[in-house]
């Protein structure tokens, strides 16, 4: 009697994750960084797909100054590289992923300008796409910095999954940009559309970074979105106690 052979395959093993983004702008190879073999993890989400479909209906004037904010792995930057956008992110990993994905398409080094959230944005922004971050403080910081560059003709879009878009999110766009509405959900993703209101140009000062002084005398400055911004966390406190002076 022949022996029975049982083959056990680990979950996800041998399955290639989806890396082909299909959008009205074309088809693009977009990969996560670091690389993953999990088939359910892509370098983009339904909100990226949604906003790219919407952008395809906007005047594709390449003379517009496009700005993309919080593009996790560069999917939007790659798809819109022909518009030579500025990509703003607070993540070094995001910037490295964007460079790697642009290189896959042999895009020129200057096809997308990469800036951090602390860098000065372009003086004029004609089209703005903001992927809504999980941290409301980061969104507020970013909108405050971007608002002076917007004008009445600017196209302003927010994009995110339904779990990241709340009433407080819409209120922030309304207060810092202008009249705001949201679209119906598609594959659990929504878009936010805002019309720039000149009255919001004077929305008040941006919230500054918080700071405090340690018992040892060091001054700690915490920018928006950093972990444990209000106080030093226990792990860091323990580490500092044992660092050589």
State where each predicted segment sits:
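N-terminal auxiliary segments of SAM/dcSAM-dependent transferases
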Residues: 5, 12-22, 134-215
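SAM-dependent Rossmann-like transferase core, predominantly class I methyltransferases
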Residues: 34-58, 187-245
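Conserved class I S-adenosyl-L-methionine
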Residues: 61-73, 245
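Conserved SAM-binding loop of SAM-dependent methyltransferases across substrates and taxa
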Residues: 73-83
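Conserved SAM-binding motif I beta-strand of class I
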Residues: 85-90
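Conserved SAM-binding loop
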Residues: 98-99
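Conserved SAM-binding strand-loop segment of SAM-dependent methyltransferases
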Residues: 107-117
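A short acidic, Gly/Pro-enriched loop at the edge of an enzyme's catalytic core
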Residues: 118-127
